[in-house]
């Protein structure tokens, strides 16, 4: 089975909570989501994956792609069930603003994360969810 995974973000530290997804969309060239855990996909290579992941959006979906490649953002994804079981699904949002006009965001970042390399930028969100595939 294949599913669309759409991710949105809210700042619950303010009252009322504020949807900040539009800010990520506006700064698409400076943000990238990574899906890891018991997953196989661009940013993960689990030995016994329960699901596969692929990006379904690009920076140009949210506005003009002004710098470099038209890279995934990760707000829209395709998830496919591979095997039944229990595990974890981790969602990491990184902020990757340019440094001295040089982009930090690149197409190699998902594979860098999968191979254990340190990523540039800062972590905006890092959440782990229980994953059950039946």
Please place each PLM-identified region on the residue numbering:
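Extracellular-facing segments of soluble proteins and assemblies that are Gly/Ser/Thr-biased and enriched
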Residues: 1-45
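Acidic Ser/Thr/Pro-rich low-complexity disordered segments
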Residues: 19, 42-49, 104-113
């Amino acid at each position: 089975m294949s599913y669309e995974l759409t991710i949105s973000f809210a700042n619950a530290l303010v009252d009322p909570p504020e949807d900040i997804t539009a800010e990520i969309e506006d700064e698409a060239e400076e943000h990238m989501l990574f899906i890891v855990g018991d997953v196989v996909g661009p940013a993960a290579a689990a030995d016994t994956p329960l699901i596969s992941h692929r990006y379904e959006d690009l920076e140009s979906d949210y506005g003009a792609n002004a710098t470099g490649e038209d890279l995934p953002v990760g707000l829209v994804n395709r998830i496919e069930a591979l095997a039944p079981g229990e595990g974890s699904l981790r969602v990491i949002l990184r902020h990757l603003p340019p440094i001295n006009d040089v982009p930090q965001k690149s197409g190699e970042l998902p594979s860098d994360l999968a191979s254990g390399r340190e990523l540039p930028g800062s972590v905006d969100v890092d959440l782990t969810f229980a994953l059950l595939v039946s």
